[in-house]
Amino acid sequence: MVDESTRKTLSSIPLLQTKAGPRDKELWVQRLKEEYQALIKYVQNNKSSDSDWFRLESNKEGTKWFGKCWYVHNLLKYEFDVEFDIPVTYPATAPEIALPELDGKTAKMYRGGKICLTDHFKPLWSRNVPKFGIAHAMALGLAPWLAVEIPDLIEKGVVAYKEKGETSS
């Protein structure tokens, strides 16, 4: 079900221990610490393998996440805003990652630009609660979605390359 490259990526992301969501005050602080450690490790791994593709930050409470992700196609870098909220039932419920500027541009997306992850990602996530976290959602959810959808959207002319400083169309 998971290819060798994905398996290698996954095995290099630390698994999380604490089963806590935003409602579990003290435990949530511990979970956030684990989330950041896993994200830092994942970004370091990506940089060392020359496959750096996103930046994320969160609000103070760690319940709203936002940043940028990018996809390189034919040597052009396509950059998108990425955002998601941590569900109150997290980690039992995976975050719904959104790329707002692509809202309505592909069938594999829900209202608000939330990417469709139901078929492949959600069952894998539910089997791995609480071990999977935000880094895993990026690696198993957003990364493959970008790899499939962005080249298709570029081919169809739905997504166009923007020079630095240009605004979205």
Curated annotation (Swiss-Prot):
Gene3D superfamilies: Ubiquitin Conjugating Enzyme. It comes from the Eukaryota. CDD domains: UBCc_UFC1 (cd11686). The active site is at 116 (glycyl thioester intermediate). The keyword Membrane does not apply. GO terms for cellular component: cytoplasm. E2-like enzyme which forms an intermediate with UFM1 via a thioester linkage. This is Ubiquitin-fold modifier-conjugating enzyme 1. It comes from Aedes aegypti (Yellowfever mosquito).
